[in-house]
Amino acid sequence: KPWKMMGRMHDKYLIADGKTYILGGRNTYNYFLGDFPGHKNFDRDVLVVCDEPQKDNSVNQLWNYFETIWEQEDCRYFHNSKKLADRQSVKKAVLELQEGYQQYFEVNKEKICDTDYADETFETEKITLLSNSIHTQAKEPVVWYQLGELMKNAKERVKIHTPYIICNDMMYNTW
């Protein structure tokens, strides 16, 4: 069905140990990873640590979102066959990734192992995760509406930290 061809999951998140997650905006195309002159695009990742995970928090909200996605009819393994893993090109790619990680780790191990994330993060009063409806067809702007409602309730200011939004002039000037 042509209207489903572009239906893909673009979510990037990693949930660890039931109390920590990373929301990512990291894209792997060279435009985003390379060091090119001119316009520089910075993808941002958001680290969230919930010291005391309660029932109503963003860690559990993200976990429930994952479960909902996982159960969708459209969600399935792209390739899950032994034949694919046995291909020489796949074996080569796996080896390149392993070697690349090892090199990265050797150069950055102090940052990786000795970073006190509590010193490099700040406490929030509230984290609200938003998403549009979960289907492959065109979507209504539900997230934009939800953002507007949250902004209307702000006491003093609104700070949006997300790797996913690109605002146009109308969006900046609406609320």
Question: Where in the sequence are the language-model features?
Answer:
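Charged, low-complexity intrinsically disordered terminal segments
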Residues: 1-12, 16-175
